């Protein structure tokens, strides 16, 4: 039987990788036929360390590349830290 593969897009920061790995372990524990692969990504927000986030697009810079990976079928789901997700009122 061929395992089903689920790809998780995640940032490469230690926190993001820890969270994605945690989700990976939980999914594989609950679904024995599921193989979960992490797709670590460098985001524009992580590259622009010398510029205030507000000047270059805000917190959304940390999630846009992951969302693009979903749209381009390079990942099936994304794991984000809520601190990186923009909030709109």
Curated annotation (Swiss-Prot):
Single Gene Ontology BP annotation: protoporphyrinogen IX biosynthetic process
GO terms (molecular function) for this protein are: hydroxymethylbilane synthase activity
Alphabetical UniProt keywords: Porphyrin biosynthesis, Transferase
Q: What class of enzyme is it?
A: transferase
Q: A single GO CC term, please?
A: cytoplasm
Query: By its UniProt entry, which Pfam families does this protein fall under?
Result: Porphobil_deam
Associated pathway: Porphyrin-containing compound metabolism; protoporphyrin-IX biosynthesis; coproporphyrinogen-III from 5-aminolevulinate: step 2/4
The EC number(s) given in the record are: 2.5.1.61
| UniProt-listed InterPro entries | HemC (IPR000860), Porphobilin_deaminase_N (IPR022417)
**Co-factor remark:** Binds 1 dipyrromethane group covalently.
Superkingdom = Bacteria
Reaction catalysed by this enzyme:
4 porphobilinogen + H2O = hydroxymethylbilane + 4 NH4(+)
**Is Transferase among the key words of this record?**
yes
Cofactors, names only = dipyrromethane
Q: What is the additional note?
A: The porphobilinogen subunits are added to the dipyrromethane group.
Give the similarity note.
Belongs to the HMBS family.
Instruction: Give the multimer and partner information.
Output: Monomer.
What is the annotated role of this protein in its UniProt record?
Answer: Tetrapolymerization of the monopyrrole PBG into the hydroxymethylbilane pre-uroporphyrinogen in several discrete steps.
Protein name, per record = Porphobilinogen deaminase
Q: Which organism is it from?
A: Dickeya chrysanthemi
Gene label: hemC
């Amino acid at each position: 039987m061929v395992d089903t593969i689920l790809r998780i897009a995640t940032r490469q920061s230690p926190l993001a990788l820890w969270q994605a790995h945690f989700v990976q372990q939980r999914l594989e524990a609950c679904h024995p036929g599921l193989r979960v692969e992490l797709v670590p990504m460098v985001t524009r927000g992580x590259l622009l360390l010398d510029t205030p986030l507000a000047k270059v697009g805000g917190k959304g810079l940390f999630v846009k590349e992951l969302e693009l990976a979903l749209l381009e079928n390079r990942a099936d789901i994304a794991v984000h830290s809520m601190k990186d997700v923009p909030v709109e009122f």
